[in-house]
Amino acid sequence: MINPLYRKHIISINDMSSNELELVLNIAAHLKFKPQPELLKNKVIASCFFEASTRTRLSFETAIHRLGASVVGFSDAHSTSLSKKGETLADTISVISTYVDAIIIRHPHEGAARLATEFSGTVPILNAGDGANQHPTQTLLDLFNIYETQGKLNNLRIAMVGDLKYGRTVHSLTQALIKFDSNHFYFIAPDTLGMPSYILHTLIDHDIKYSMHLNLAEVIPELDILYMTRVQKERLDPTEYINVKAQFVLQIHHLLHARANMRILHPLPRVDEIAYEVDQTPYAYYFQQAGNGVFTRQALLALVLNKYLTE
């Protein structure tokens, strides 16, 4: 049986069915407990980061090495012909695709990853974040952690806190969880950084419950997952950043009435939105979350490059 993700571009979480999402999570769980150090032996994968990244890039490159593949690429767009010589993204991808078996791309411009698919031929493109648009591999690792801690992806109460306007992680995660039944969302953000209307309209179209709040404490007792985000300084003007950066800070006293099963996730980096004392509580799961990113990215690479990998 051919796996449905073989040679598929991974650009948006919306491009994946619930069955495909579950396939990635199942393979990730398998690889976590049964490493396959030669699964991608002799494969070469390009890591093309036109925008700064630490966790995503290192997580992907660790995943590549642990599967036995080789990695080539760059972490600074200013060192490339695209920047120095004016080469187009189309030409860059057209050339790189002749060298490698898959291309991982992060780019500051929305839509860049999908544009890359038009010039990569049969080489799959994996979107590692395009502007404020999508970050599907982060979403997959978020889903993995939710399933690992809650044992399900449906009938959950999930709060998303902080920068919901520019935070591509919360956009992608909400769209992924829409594919599973009976989830209830709580959006906690200042008015200037609320969830985009297109996400809210999608929730309404699917008859999914959501509510908007300005108070973190009032919803914590109801939650299974508390998804914190930082206010993204690089996407705001300085005045707006100063006004909102510390408006929603999770303190240890907020957790006094939390459910025993509740877990705190964060895509990282953290600035000051989670007090360091919270790290020592059983609710904190963001460092385990980051570690699990290696397994979910291993699973995704394994699936797009292995025709018959289904379990």
UniProtKB/Swiss-Prot annotation:
Matches recorded under SUPFAM superfamilies: Aspartate/ornithine carbamoyltransferase (SSF53671)
Enzyme class: transferase
E.C. designation(s): 2.1.3.2
InterPro entries in alphabetical order: Asp/Orn_carbamoyltranf_P-bd (IPR006132), Asp/Orn_carbamoylTrfase (IPR006130), Asp/Orn_carbamoylTrfase_sf (IPR036901), Asp_carbamoyltransf (IPR002082), Asp_carbamoyltransf_Asp/Orn-bd (IPR006131)
Annotated GO MF terms: amino acid binding; aspartate carbamoyltransferase activity
Alphabetical list of Pfam families matching this protein: OTCace, OTCace_N
Homology family: Belongs to the aspartate/ornithine carbamoyltransferase superfamily. ATCase family.
The protein's assembly and partners: Heterododecamer (2C3:3R2) of six catalytic PyrB chains organized as two trimers (C3), and six regulatory PyrI chains organized as three dimers (R2).
Name by which UniProt lists this protein: Aspartate carbamoyltransferase catalytic subunit
Natural source organism: Baumannia cicadellinicola subsp. Homalodisca coagulata
Gene this protein is translated from: pyrB
